[in-house]
Amino acid sequence: MFMSQIDKLRKQIDKIDFQILNLLKKRSKIAENIGKEKKSNNLFRPERQASILRNILKKNGNNLNPLFILSFWRSIFLSQINVQGGIKLILSNNISKKYIKTIYDYFSHDIEIITMKSNSKALEKVYNGKNILTILPYPSNNKGAKWWTNKRLEKLYAIAALPFFLRKKKSPSLIIISKYKPEIEKDSYFLYKSKYPIRDKNMILETKSNKYYLYRSNNMINNNDLKIFGILPKHYES
């Protein structure tokens, strides 16, 4: 009797598994059609992914571990980006070794990673390629995080920061760079670069390097002395 009940429950699980598979197939088809309709070269939309994840986490309550939800949906996101054409991730050797777990947690283990000798080479690939991203240390006062003054970045954008789950009052460790200008969502924050110190109650100074200032704000600010460095989805605070 006991085993008979277990068999019934297992059959229910099998049925749910097939339902999940069929729903994923439908989702992939819709994603493919979206890719055809929008006719955009930019396949990676972190602000859209962040919005989806927040909505799912709100629905979840405390039923499932948020890390499981992140892992599951990241795999879905990447598989459907691959259906539309795929993306590549270029990393310098020092980044790939130190932060590989954080990167895989964000993109899933299926992401294609190409390593290069330097940040400059990685930025060059992003600038000249299509749907190529690179990841660099989040701008800070640390020695290895001063790359953001590189002239190559004048036509590139910061589009997201890692990790997605971030404890309150903690700073991100990594930032994603793309050639495609990011979209503005309601849960976004802005990074601005300036040659001058700016006094504005809506901005905070993230870091300073080589006579440049990097500011962060939750608002779009119109100031001729500020240049958009990035538009990033806000983190999910835990």
Explain the meaning of each model-derived region.
Residues 2-238:
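Domain-level signature for soluble enzymes in the chorismate/prephenate branch of the shikimate pathway
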